[in-house]
Amino acid sequence: MTRCIAFHSYKGGTGKTTLACNSAALLARKGYKVCLLDLDIYAPSFQSYFEREPIVGINDFLNSNVEVDKAMIDYTSAVENQKDNIRATDSSYPYPTRSENEKKLRKKGKLWIGFSNMQKKGVFELENADSATKRDIIRRFIYLRERLISDFHADYIIIDTSPGMRFWSINSLAIADILLLTLKMGSLDVDGTRIAVNEIYKSFTKFGSKAYLLYNLIAGYCVPATVASRNEMVPTVESTSVPQEGMTLLNKLEQPLNEVDFVERLSSDLGIPAILSIPCYCDIQFSRREFLTVLRYPEHPFTKQIEGLVTAL
């Protein structure tokens, strides 16, 4: 049975694209057939991870300009032979790259990618569509999922959505079975996550979708630590009651909580379980170029986190 998973966030900068791309690549490496869709049409970035500038995008399919087989690119061989962006002479990197034996032992998976057309014409066509065209595009969203299942026999459909509560991100969520609401442990993310859950996520879960909180870029892993104290980095809440109407967890400042307690409390408050909390790894976060960590550095702790995520799914 195909699983359709959408990575979403209330605001940008949560790392959802990194998580979506690495999850898709890891599943393909494990032998699954994976379709990866860039539906963040306002700020597409798959081209940075996969080093390709698409001519045709998935938004061209939604605009009825091409069929789905023209919008999906078979990227399996390119991923298998992905070259390191870090120079081979850089011996300071602490994690081993893929060995030849590891490459041979992998099962044969498939990875198709639906890039988003970066040209402004494609974005304007979607953004300025009239009501009748938007209804047709909604049908195309559903048709897209059906075609990826029937024609590509996908085991997984991974969607990177636009952040926020835009028309296109909501429709991306509507075709997904599993919704991963990605957030950081800051007041902007938590407040926005509360809005997203109350405004749209409860409607989806009411009709059978499964939603999870996915924490990313959690402080505390990188050494040396920041000048902020532990209590300053971790959100605080009042320990005995649920926040009242109009108040958020981060407005309550009576008792500091560690990450585990905070995650449990927010999940209880929103009625959505947390699936994973991923630390911030500075070597990835501050790299000058994007790359697929799970393929290049299978022993990296971030790769182990993605292993845990796909296993949980």
Regions found by a protein language model. Name each.
Residues T2-A6, C35, L111-I113, D155-I158:
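Residue-level preference for the first positions of well-ordered beta-strands
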Residues M1-C4, P224-M233, V310-L313:
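Acidic-aromatic/histidine active-site loop/patch
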Residues F286-K304:
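C-terminal boundary of histidine-terminating zinc-finger modules
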Residues C21, E299-L313:
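Short, amphipathic alpha-helical "lid/cap" segments that border enzyme active or binding sites
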Residues I41-I149, F286-L292:
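P-loop/Walker-type NTP enzyme "switch/lid" segment
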Residues T2-Y42:
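Walker A/P-loop phosphate-binding motif and the immediately C-terminal alpha-helix
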Residues K30, S277-S287:
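Short, glycine-rich, amphipathic interfacial segments at transmembrane boundaries or analogous
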Residues R29, I138-I275:
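Conserved catalytic-core segment of NTP-binding enzymes
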